């Protein structure tokens, strides 16, 4: 598979209808890669319902190849029955995928990839602010959709820091964002923020001081906006990765990246 263009978008939560017009624009002899910044929602129900949705996506969008950062409202791909770990030469590292759905791939936390010519670090996961509502629904016999290992563990965060401290990346892809960039105007007023576990956001703040990066992209907060210089949050927009990178990297000396 030779991917000719790369795009990036935010949370889809299982609804891939936004990609219909994009797929129609892809030449019939090309494949375009789409990075989803977490909560793709393809491993949410852990039942036949997920399989039906993935089958529909694989059939409907054959000229799009999806690469999913892990969000919080979905199972870790390694916990999903039938997942294989496959090396992908296009991006230079391993992904998880189910062979029945060849255009859906799950990026691995704490791994580096090459998207186009951009050295990229990927760190998925986040805390669910509706955790207790989901657990209550589950206790009443409904489906909660809460995953105990939704966040990176302390050990995982430490390993990522130790592995990549001092490294240089063109691009960082995360689901949530560093604590200092959080869009607090989007916080839900009925959520007691003192009960929210923001350990991952605090760690990401530390990580961004321990690596060099050109651009940082995240999802999670359901809005499209700039968070800081060289940092953007995506939700519904579908952007060409090259356009984002060229915009932010034109004022940087990237010869050492």
What are the residue ranges of the model-derived segments?
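Active-site-proximal beta-strand elements of phosphoester/diester hydrolases
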Residues: 3-13, 117-126, 171-175, 233-237
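Proline-aspartate-enriched helix->loop->beta-strand connector
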Residues: 31, 169-178, 212-213, 218
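Active-site-proximal loop/helix segment associated with metal-binding centers of metalloenzymes
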Residues: 91, 116-198
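Conserved beta-sheet core of the metallophosphoesterase superfamily
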Residues: 58, 65-69, 86-91, 180-255
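A short acidic (Asp/Glu
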Residues: 18-19, 45-48, 78-81, 132-133, ...
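Short, solvent-exposed loop/turn segments at secondary-structure junctions
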Residues: 13-14, 41-43, 73-75, 125-129, ...
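A structural micro-motif
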Residues: 4, 64, 104, 118, ...
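Core catalytic region of metal-dependent phosphoesterases/phosphodiesterases
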Residues: 9, 14-115, 193, 204
